[in-house]
C-alpha cells in the first residue's frame, strides 16, 4: 500500500511523472479518472487553503468527497487514534487526507488503513504536497532548469513543516538552499544560515520563500510584537529592488509581517500561481495513489 506521508515516499522519477500529469491538469477541465471513488478528508487542525485544494482536486477527478467534522467527531470525545482509524477504514474510502497538530499521526493512521493516506500536514514534521507544489512552481518558472538555483527560505523555519519538507525535496533536486531566521527560529542544520535578512542575501537568490511565523507552535512569547520581527524579516521592495527572482509563500500571508503589500502585488510574487498549481499537484497525487492501489 502506497501512502504520501513525507516527500521521501516518491522518488525523483515518480515526481517528474507527477509534474507531467499536473501540467496537463492545469487546464482545470473535469476528469473522470476517479469516478465512483470516495475520498475522505479529516483535518484535526484548521485549514482553508489545503482542505479546499484537496477537495477541489478530488472533485475535478470525478471523486466524491466526505469531509469529517472533527469538532463533532468521536476523537474530540476521547476516542483513540486506533479506533478512529478502524472506523474510517470501515467506511471503505479509496483515500484519506489527514491533517493533525501532532507529528506522526498520518503515519500511525496509515498503518491501520486499507487505502492510501495522504498527509495534509502533521505538526512540525511534514507537508509533502506543499513542497511538491512549490517545486512544481519553481520547475515551471525556470523551464525545468532548477539544478543549482539559489533559494533563500526566510522566517520561522524551525517550527515549519513546509520548510522541513521543502528542505528535503529541494536538496534532492540539487537546489542551493540558504536559511534566514532569528536564532530561536533556526533549526540545527548543515545548510548555510544567516540571522538577518539583507540586500546581499537577496541579490544572491533566484527564489525567496517566505514563511509565516508559527505563533501557535511557540511555547513562549518570542517577540513583543510581530512588527519587531517584520523589521528584520519582512520581504520588502526596498530589499528586493529590481532583482530578477521569484517570491513564494505557502499561505496564509501575514501582510507587512511576512511580505509587504507592495511586494504582494509585484509580478515576481507567485503566491496565487502556487494555489493553482496546488490543485493540479494534488490531482496528480490522488490519481496516482488510488489507481496504483487498485491496479
Swiss-Prot record:
Gene3D superfamilies: Aspartate/ornithine carbamoyltransferase (3.40.50.1370)
Keywords: Pyrimidine biosynthesis, Transferase
EC number annotated for this UniProt entry: 2.1.3.2
Residues involved in carbamoyl phosphate binding: 49-50, 99, 127, 130, 251-252
InterPro entries: Asp/Orn_carbamoyltranf_P-bd, Asp/Orn_carbamoylTrfase, Asp/Orn_carbamoylTrfase_sf, Asp_carbamoyltransf, Asp_carbamoyltransf_Asp/Orn-bd
Pathway(s) it belongs to: Pyrimidine metabolism; UMP biosynthesis via de novo pathway; (S)-dihydroorotate from bicarbonate: step 2/3
Binding-site residues, L-aspartate: 77, 161, 212
Protein name in UniProt: Aspartate carbamoyltransferase catalytic subunit
Recorded GO CC terms: cytosol
HAMAP family: Asp_carb_tr
Record lineage: Bacteria, Pseudomonadati, Campylobacterota, Epsilonproteobacteria, Campylobacterales
Enzyme class, broadest EC rank: transferase
Function: Catalyzes the condensation of carbamoyl phosphate and aspartate to form carbamoyl aspartate and inorganic phosphate, the committed step in the de novo pyrimidine nucleotide biosynthesis pathway.
Organism: Campylobacter jejuni subsp. doylei (strain ATCC BAA-1458 / RM4099 / 269.97)
One Gene Ontology term of the molecular function aspect: amino acid binding
A Pfam family matched in the record: OTCace
Family: Belongs to the aspartate/ornithine carbamoyltransferase superfamily. ATCase family.
Record's signal peptide: none
Annotated NCBIfam families: asp_carb_tr (TIGR00670), PRK00856.1 (NF002032)
Catalytic activity: carbamoyl phosphate + L-aspartate = N-carbamoyl-L-aspartate + phosphate + H(+)
Example GO BP: 'de novo' UMP biosynthetic process
Subunit structure: Heterododecamer (2C3:3R2) of six catalytic PyrB chains organized as two trimers (C3), and six regulatory PyrI chains organized as three dimers (R2).
